[in-house]
Amino acid sequence: MKKILVVEDEEGLRLLYEEELKAEGYDVLTARNGREAIQQLEQGKPDLIVLDIVMPVMDGMEALGRIVGKERKIPIILNTSYPGYREDFMSWAADAYVTKSADLTELKGKIRELLEKKGKNRS
């Protein structure tokens, strides 16, 4: 079972993502901010990370920089309500960029795509 780390400060969204991704057959870990995400990484590597950008304690851009510096092989999807971040230089380090929506179809599709790509790169 593929393991996904969802990093989201809004509890309602975090629970929605967790529920929806578990229904898709994924093992889901959650974190409320970038610092918790880094701690989760130290406990075990997920197969993919869904990362919010605007969060307290440590924002997604700082977390992205730290994660990429340590674990470049883990695909990262930036997931935010603010489409302007797509232009941020640091966001280019992510594997995908998805604007938040109550409909998780795009996010789920991007997760499948990146996990399939990661699986092919291992072969």
PLM regions with names:
Residues 8:
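Conserved acidic carboxylate
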Residues 15-23:
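Charged docking surfaces used in two-component/phosphorelay signaling
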Residues 25-32, 40:
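Short hydrophobic/Thr-rich beta-strand motif most characteristic of the beta2 strand and flanking loop
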Residues 33-36, 59-62:
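Acidic catalytic/metal-coordinating carboxylates
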Residues 52:
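Active-site residues of response regulator receiver
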Residues 55:
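Receiver (REC) domain active-site loop signature in two-component systems and cognate sites
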Residues 62, 82-109:
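Alpha4 helix (beta4-alpha4-beta5 surface) of REC/receiver domains from two-component response regulators
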Residues 77-79:
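Hydrophobic/aromatic residues positioned on beta-strands within the core alpha/beta folds
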